[in-house]
Curated annotation (Swiss-Prot):
<dbReference type="GO" id="GO:0006432">
    <property type="term" value="P:phenylalanyl-tRNA aminoacylation"/>
</dbReference>
<dbReference type="InterPro" id="IPR009061">
    <property type="entry name" value="DNA-bd_dom_put_sf"/>
</dbReference>
<keyword id="KW-0030">Aminoacyl-tRNA synthetase</keyword>
<keyword id="KW-0436">Ligase</keyword>
<comment type="subunit">
    <text>Tetramer of two alpha and two beta subunits.</text>
</comment>
<comment type="similarity">
    <text>Belongs to the phenylalanyl-tRNA synthetase beta subunit family. Type 1 subfamily.</text>
</comment>
<keyword id="KW-0963">Cytoplasm</keyword>
<dbReference type="InterPro" id="IPR033714">
    <property type="entry name" value="tRNA_bind_bactPheRS"/>
</dbReference>
<keyword id="KW-0547">Nucleotide-binding</keyword>
<feature type="binding site">
    <location>
        <position position="454"/>
    </location>
    <ligand>
        <name>Mg(2+)</name>
    </ligand>
</feature>
<keyword id="KW-0820">tRNA-binding</keyword>
<dbReference type="GO" id="GO:0004826">
    <property type="term" value="F:phenylalanine-tRNA ligase activity"/>
</dbReference>
<dbReference type="GO" id="GO:0000287">
    <property type="term" value="F:magnesium ion binding"/>
</dbReference>
<keyword id="KW-0479">Metal-binding</keyword>
<dbReference type="GO" id="GO:0000049">
    <property type="term" value="F:tRNA binding"/>
</dbReference>
<feature type="binding site">
    <location>
        <position position="460"/>
    </location>
    <ligand>
        <name>Mg(2+)</name>
    </ligand>
</feature>
<dbReference type="InterPro" id="IPR002547">
    <property type="entry name" value="tRNA-bd_dom"/>
</dbReference>
């Protein structure tokens, strides 16, 4: 927001420099982005009056003038401006004046005619105003007055950045209020008399959406002269705040917006078919806006309408059909309180952003509308004349915001600030902020002001006290606390260890947004509802992720589109699962996910390129699990998932509970996501594997180990892991290792069956095993496999 320093100082004028004022504003939390002078550096320019104006005898585009600058005689000045004429009040640079760029004014002759000065335009004085010709000053401008004094040009435009919670400072009144509080100065609110009604005209209002518009005011002003020029002081104040002058009606509403922070609008009364309705848009309605564009309205948009249809998008943009123009005689002024949630995001969905919507979506003082209406009426009648009707107001108290009641404990205040502030000082600060305060038993009971939507909790009050007390007034003290050693169990597994292992395995870590495209997510999780954001950054980031795969696969596509065919990525983060049983209706789970695509190894002359498959990623996952305490407990059970290949996917099970999934991306899903080649993915709950197996040191056996290889035939549906688990369960402690080293299907093996080659390592720590001992272990294993899986030895 931009504002004029001199305008703020009309309200409150602390005895400090511009630099000090800007520093003070920044420390209040209203960060100053820049300060610019409102005019260039010049001197010797005064208010003049063109007494005579005649055509130059030797130049068609020049005029010879005599100008009164309040001296002993009239000055002869040659001027080329097309708007130069007799009786005009002008900005006259006299002999010796210095204009921006160190341009000095001297007596000279132009085409043979003497010229003792220069009639200046805005641009020649370094003033940013779009105009052609010289400056036209009001007729009551006093001749001979220094122009810098007359237009208050020794002023600065200050630009500040506001956080969304400080909508109360989007006005001169709000900024002045803050400066007054910190300097302990009273704010000089401009005095104006309420305009009494002189006509009986009223407007019938129908409030059909009170939850979106709890308060709505209209007022008729008839016989308005919209051709009247806006006074120079009004134009200058608008200009210094970054708004150009348009016509007196628009200028007045913009002035109220800047001064009080209340957006207003004016309708041409002749173009409004009463009653005026405040309602939600209907499907199929359209509105031609003031800029000539047509908005196709959505049913979530609040409208101002009449009997013939929409008049304006409430709080955002007016309609062309009901707008004020040069032929307008009677107007209807509007001031309203629109609920922030009814306006937030609506302007963006139509590609709009206005000063009005910027304020309404952050929150406008809900007690300001009548004051703003009175102030605007007074200014309008002063500038344009007119006859005024009564203010017509419709309000719904049930939907108006309620003032927040907040308790602040002395203990909490001291703990957060680390400094004790006297009770009287705290009470004084809160009172000066416009809050209602009472104190008893070391607790302040505070009622927020109507303009402070952001005062909701105890910490908000602590922040306010710290701002006004001054951060620099809080002494620096080293924290005093009892330190405790961080408890770290030997069984705890650090996530960084897993990340390092994945990086060592040629993966790269990715960090993607938690907000994802719902269309992409529906490809991966078609049967699962996601948490949809009501006010997203964009349509492509409007849903919370159900898994990390949406972001990771998007990263794979990004790399493939840039000729990176071999991609291995992993990510850790939260996924968000809608759950009515969880807090706030969403379950947040921390997971580890990885994807791989392309060749198994980088291109090399000694080897043939092979594409990755399910078992490559499974092997990497098993390597990760080997660092945890769950490696021998985790099982991979065949299971189908909508986005995965039905023959190449599995659930990751731990103690009978599914903790993740792994598989090859379904070709149809890969096509929809724009991916090339085979892509393999996994995702697993981190907390389920976040412990590691504590190493148990054992003496190496002095006795020889014995290996026995078995080739057993089982049904094709039997999982090899189940076979290995069965061996471990029945063989006893002498079976130290069991491994699968070959799988065969073909000649010699019945159809629908497969041959599993497994090795048994049998060893005793107490003695050398005899052949009978070894055969006994093998016999027990074969018997169990036959009973459980109907397995038999392959011939």
């Amino acid at each position: 927001m931009k504002f004029s320093e001199s305008w703020v100082r009309e309200w409150v004028n602390p005895a400090i420099s511009t630099a000090q004022l800007c520093d003070q504003i920044t420390m209040l939390g209203l960060e100053v982005d820049g300060v610019e002078k409102v005019a260039g550096d010049f001197s010797g320019v005064v208010v003049g009056e063109v007494v005579e104006c005649a055509q130059h005898p030797d130049a068609d585009k020049l005029r010879v003038t005599k100008v009164n600058v309040g001296g002993d005689r009239l000055l002869d000045i040659v001027c080329g401006a097309p708007n130069c004429r007799q009786g005009l009040k002008v900005a006259c640079a006299t002999e010796g004046a210095v204009l921006p760029g160190d341009f000095k004014i001297k007596k000279t002759k132009l085409r043979g005619q003497p010229s003792e000065g220069m009639l200046c335009s805005f641009s020649e004085l370094g003033i940013d105003v779009e105009s052609s010709g010289i400056i036209e000053l009001p007729q009551n401008a006093p001749v001979g007055t220094n122009l810098r004094d007359y237009l208050t040009l020794d002023d600065n435009t200050v630009e500040i950045s506001l956080t969304p919670n400080r909508a109360d400072c989007l006005s001169i009144a709000g900024i002045a209020r803050e400066i007054g509080v910190v300097n302990k100065l009273a704010v000089n609110t401009p005095h104006f008399e309420s305009v009494k009604a002189t006509i009986t005209d009223k407007v019938d209002i129908q409030l059909h959406a009170p939850e979106a518009c709890p308060r709505y005011l209209l007022r008729v002003v008839k016989n308005v002269n919209v051709q009247a020029p806006s006074p120079m002081w009004l134009q200058e104040k608008l200009r210094r705040c970054g708004i150009r002058s348009i016509d007196p009606v628009v200028d007045v509403t913009n002035y109220i917006l800047l001064e009080l922070g209340q957006p207003m609008h004016a309708f041409d009364a002749a173009k409004v078919a009463q009653p005026v309705q405040v309602r939600m848009a209907k499907s199929g309605e359209a509105l031609v806006l003031l800029d000539g564009s047509t908005a196709k309205l959505k049913d979530n948009t609040l409208l101002i309408a009449d009997q013939n249809g929409p008049l304006a998008m409430a709080g955002i943009f007016g309609g062309q059909a009901s707008g004020v123009n040069a032929e307008t005689k009677d107007i209807i002024l509007e001031a309203a309180f629109f609920a922030p949630l009814a306006i937030a995001g609506r302007a963006r969905q139509y590609g709009l952003h206005t000063d009005s919507s910027h304020r309404f979506e952050r929150g406008v003082d809900f007690e300001l509308q009548r004051q703003a209406m009175e102030r605007a009426t007074a200014l309008l009648v002063e500038i344009c004349g007119g006859e005024v009707g009564d203010i017509c107001e419709v309000a719904s108290d049930a939907f108006l915001p309620k003032l927040n009641q907040v308790s602040l404990r002395r203990e909490k205040l001291d703990a957060l600030l680390g400094h004790h502030i006297e009770t009287e000082t705290v009470t004084d600060i809160l009172t000066r902020l416009g809050l209602q305060v009472s104190y008893a038993n070391d607790v302040w009971q505070v009622t927020s002001a109507s303009w402070r939507f952001d005062i909701e909790i105890e910490e908000d009050l602590v922040e306010e006290i710290a701002r006004i007390y001054g951060y620099n007034s809080i002494p620096n003290k080293a924290p005093l606390a009892h330190l405790r050693m961080r408890e770290h169990k030997e069984a705890d597994l650090d996530l960084a260890r897993i990340k390092t292992a994945l990086v060592d395995a040629d993966y790269q870590e990715a960090i993607t947004y938690s907000f994802v495209d719902p269309k992409i997510q529906s490809v991966l999780h078609p049967q699962q509802d996601a948490l949809v954001l009501p006010n997203p950054i964009s349509v492509e980031m409007s849903a919370m992720r159900l898994s990390l795969l949406s972001g990771l696969l998007g990263a794979v596509q990004y790399n493939q589109n840039r000729q990176q065919t071999r991609v291995r990525l992993f990510e850790t983060g939260l996924r968000f699962i809608p759950d009515t049983q969880a807090e706030f209706g969403v379950r947040q789970e921390f997971v580890l996910a990885a994807v791989m695509t392309g060749n198994k190894k980088a291109e090399h002359w000694a080897g043939k390129a092979e594409s990755v498959d399910f078992f490559d990623l499974k092997g990497d996952l098993e390597s990760i699990l080997s660092l945890t305490g769950t490696r021998n407990l985790v099982k991979f059970v065949a299971k189908s998932y909508p986005a995965l290949h039905p023959g190449q996917s599995a659930a990751i099970m731990l103690n009978g509970e599914e903790i993740g999934f792994i598989g090859t991306l379904h070709p149809n899903a890969a096509k929809q996501l724009g991916l090339n080649g085979k892509t393999v993915v996994f995702e697993i709950l981190w907390q389920a594997i976040a412990t590691r197996q504590v190493v148990q040191a054992k003496e190496i056996s002095r006795f020889p180990a014995n290996r026995r290889d078995l080739a057993i035939v089982v049904a094709e549906s039997v999982a090899a892991s189940d076979v290995l688990d069965a061996c471990r369960e029945v063989a006893g402690e002498t079976l130290t290792q069991v491994n699968l080293f070959d799988v065969y299907q073909g000649n010699g093996v019945a159809e629908g069956h497969k041959s599993l080659a497994i090795s048994l390592i049998i060893q005793d720590n107490e003695k050398t095993l005899e052949e009978d001992d070894i055969n006994a272990v093998v016999s027990v294993v074969l018997s169990e496999l036959k009973q459980r899986f109907n397995a038999y030895l392959r011939d």
